[in-house]
Amino acid sequence: MFSKPLVLNRLFRSTRRLWLCVLIIFSPTVALAGEWAGTQTDFHSFDQYDFEVDGLDCKIVVPKEIAEGRPWIWRARFFGHEPQTEIALLKKGFHVAYVDVADLFGSPKAVDRWDRFYGYLTESHGFSKKTVLEGLSRGGLIIYNWAAINPDKVHCIYADAPVCDFKSWPMKKSSKATWQKCLDAYEMTEAEALRFHGNPIDNLKPLAEAGIALLHIIGEADEVVPVADN
C-alpha cells in the first residue's frame, strides 16, 4: 500500500502532465502572412480575404491565432450581418468561411458549390474535416440540405430564424418573382415543387442519427419565416 502523501504526489504529477499535454495539443498557432490571395479588408479587426476559386466568389476571415486542428464556422448568406457569433469564434481561433450561393435556395446547385468549397478548404488549407454551420433566414435551406448529405462533416448547426421549407418561404411569403427563381434553381414546376420531399423539414433523420447538435433562435411573431411552417 502506498502512503496517502505519495499517492497524492503521484496524482498531482500525472494531472500536471495531462494538462501539459492538453495545452500542447490545443495550443494556437499564429496566422501565416501570405496564405490567402485576393483582396484583403478588415472584419472587426480581423483580416478578411475576398477571392475566387473554381469560379466561386469566396470569403475567409482569419483569426489572429489559429486553434489546433483549424476549426471553422461556415456562414450561409447575409455575410457580415449580426456578426457576433463569428467575432466570438474568431477570438477562439476559428476561421470564418463563406461562399456565395445567392438565389440558389439550397438547391443541388448550391450543394455542389458547397462541396467544391469544402474540398478546397480541407484539402488545400488543412481545415478541420468537420465544420460548424451557421444559417440566417433563407440560409437555413443550404445548411440543412448540405448537412443531410454530409452529416459526417458537420460538428453542429446554429440557425437564426431558418427557412426549412421553401413552400413556406419563398412560395407563400415572398414575391412571385422570387418563387420563380427558386423553381428555376431546382429546375421544377410549381406542381413538382408541391410534391417535393427534399426540404430540410423532410430530411432530419441523417442529422439525428449522426447526433448533430442543433441550436435555433426563433421569434414567435415572425411573419416572414413562420415557426409553425419551418
Stretch-by-stretch model annotation:
Residues 212, 226-230:
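Short alpha-helix in the alpha/beta-hydrolase fold that links the catalytic acid
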Residues 116-137, 151-153:
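Gly/Ser-rich "nucleophile elbow"/oxyanion-hole loop immediately N-terminal to the catalytic nucleophile
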Residues 31-68, 175-186:
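A domain-start/cap signature at the N-terminus of enzymes
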Residues 40-45, 162, 167-206:
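Mobile cap/lid helix-loop segments that gate and shape the active-site cleft of serine hydrolases
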Residues 81-97:
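Short amphipathic alpha-helix adjacent to the substrate-entry channel of hydrolases
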Residues 210, 215-218, 222:
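Short beta-strand/loop motif that positions the catalytic acidic residue
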Residues 105-126, 145:
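Alpha/beta-hydrolase active-site loop
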Residues 140-151:
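Short glycine-enriched nucleophile-adjacent loop
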